[in-house]
Amino acid sequence: VTNTQPVQVHACTRTITAAHTVPRILPGTLLARRGEPVLATGTLIAMLEDATWELLAPDVPDEFAMLGCGGVYEHTAPTLPGQAVRIEVERGPAPDVGRQTWTARAFNVDTGQQAGVLHHQVATVDRERFYRRMGR
């Protein structure tokens, strides 16, 4: 895997539905019964990671796996169903094989507030070797 491009930026928009909210994330739990119908933190993290994959995956050959190996996340403002988030992803220069660092930010299009930010390290490793080491 070689990345000679300096900084890349990717942006996408996701509309929040009831399925993305706190009561829906773990059906049958106290969280589902008492949680507010706002964008769930776990769902927002998944959206940020998905947007990142849209940027990173095209540069990574199929024989390599991309695995999260560190990160810091902040959920900074609520988002309601029907509202949209614009996700902006940035990646700095990446080594030939190893760790990549990227930052994904979600902004509530309707309120202008930052909804969340994820700073994430991703390791790019040989897929077959990884699964051998994991005993699979």
Residue ranges and their predicted role:
Residues 41-43:
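A short mixed-secondary-structure module that forms the rim of ligand-binding clefts
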Residues 80-81, 90-136:
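HotDog/MaoC-like acyl-thioester-processing domains
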Residues 52-86:
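Hydrophobic beta-strand-centered segment that forms part of the acyl-chain substrate-binding groove
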Residues 10-16, 71, 75, 89, ...:
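A structural signal for short, well-ordered beta-strand segments
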Residues 18-20, 77, 124-126:
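Non-catalytic surface loops within mature trypsin-like serine protease
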Residues 2-39:
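Catalytic strand-loop segment that frames the active site of acyl-thioester-processing enzymes
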